[in-house]
Amino acid sequence: MKVTPDGITWFGCAATIFISVAFLAQGEFLIGALLFGAFGLIDLLDGTMARMLGTAGPWGAFLDSTLDRISDAAVICALIYFYINIDSSSSQLAVVAGIVALVMSLMTSYARAKAESLDAKCTVGIAERAERNLLIWISLLVSALFTDVMPYALTLLAVLSTVTVIQRILFVRKQLVLQA
């Protein structure tokens, strides 16, 4: 069986959805963190492999970006699901922050895509996907090994993602207003 960059992209998304449902939504943060970290590294391979094989192109970029959004949503939705179903003093914070983080994480990517479709650069942002995933991964480990910091991590993720969206809006506005 031949391994292709697109195959790695699909596999990474499917694995992330599985990890989210099987472990994160159940509060199994340690195994979830270990697998999330491992498959996060595998996710880096598709683009690298495509460039090495000379097969990188618009289709692969589109597929990777789209499935990355699905993966991101699966992780955050699984965490929201977990906190909806437990009774803790911080579960309401986790749910609200998770919803905001989900929306703003998706808006971060949308802002870049829309800017690029208008021939504007969108190269700013304090919390791009790598930073968001690193924050989630570290928070899963800390929550599993020490104390539950995930509600606060989701709050930080919501704030950082919101700041990133605002940065992108302002950055793109400068370009598009100057072009007009």
Question: What name fits each language-model region?
Answer:
Residues 1-35, 40, 74-180:
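Hydrophobic alpha-helical transmembrane segments
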Residues 47-90:
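Basic, amphipathic juxtamembrane/active-site segments
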